[in-house]
Amino acid sequence: VRESIELIQGASEPFSLERFLEGSQTPVFFGSGVNNFGVEDVLNALVNWAPTPQPRDAGKRMVEPDEAKFSGFVFKIQANMDPKHRDRIAFFRVCSGEYQPGMKVFHVREGKEMKIPNALTFMANDRVLMTNAVAGDIIGIYNHGQLHIGDTLTQGEKLQFTGIPNFAPELFRAARSKDPFKAKQLQKGLQELGEEGAIQVFTGEFGNILLGAVGQLQFEIVAQRLADEYKVDALYESTDVSTARWLSFPDDKTKREFEAEQNARLATDVNGNEVYLATSIYNLETTMKHWPQVQFHTTREMNQVF
C-alpha cells in the first residue's frame, strides 16, 4: 500500500483549492462504498471545498444566486426510475430564489404557467418530498413530457440559461423494430431516450429513424433500455452517414431552395431542428462551399431551436 501511495504521489500534482475552484483541477479520492472506506473523506471534502452557487448566464443577463425571484433550468431527464410506475423525472437546478411546494412558475419555452406540486430529492433509492429549495439545490420534478433538457422556469421573466451543449455525433445506425407491430413502441421509446439525451435521434422525410452517438457504448445502452423498459427488440444497421450538422438559414427562400436540392440528405432532431446528414467530410465541405449563405453548426444548446 505504501508503494502504491508513493507511486500516486509521484504521478499526480498536489491539490490546490484555488485551481479546483477555477475548474482546472479535479481531486481524486480512493475508497470503497461497500466497505465504508474513504466515504467520509469525500463527504467532508464536499462540505469544505464545494463552491457556493455562482452567477449564471441566462442570455439576456447574468442571474445572481441571491436574487429573490425563483429561476432555474432542467439539466437531466431520467425515464423509468421506478419500473413499477414508468415515471419520468426532470432534474432541475435552482439558480435563484426559493422553491415552495405547489408554487406556480413560468415555463419559458412553452410561454405559459405550470405548477410544481411535489418536488423530490433523492438519497440512494429513497425519495423525499422537498419542503423548500434554494440556489444550488437540485430538485426532481415529475415530468409527463412538458419539460425538456435545457428548459428554463422562472417567476415570469423570459430568461434562457445556457451551458448544456449537444455535439454533432460521430457514429450512426439506422434503427427499426424486429416486430413491425411494435414500430410505434420503438418510436415512442427513442423519442423519450432522445429527449433524455441518452442518444441523438434523427427522423427522415419518410419516417426512417437514424441514431447518432459519440461512442459505441451509447448504442448498446439504448438497445438494452429499449428491451428492458419498452419491450422492443430493434435492429441497428449500418448507414452511409458519416457526420451531421444542424442548419440555419438567412431567409425562407434560401431554406426552400436548399431543401429542394438536398432533400435526400435532410432529417430533423427531437426538437424539430433540420439536420444535414453528410456521407463524408468531403461531401460536407463541398455542400458548404456550394451554400455559403447557409450555416452548418457542429453544436447546439440543448433545447435550442434554430
What are these language model-derived features?
Residues 1-306:
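Structural and coupling elements of P-loop NTPases
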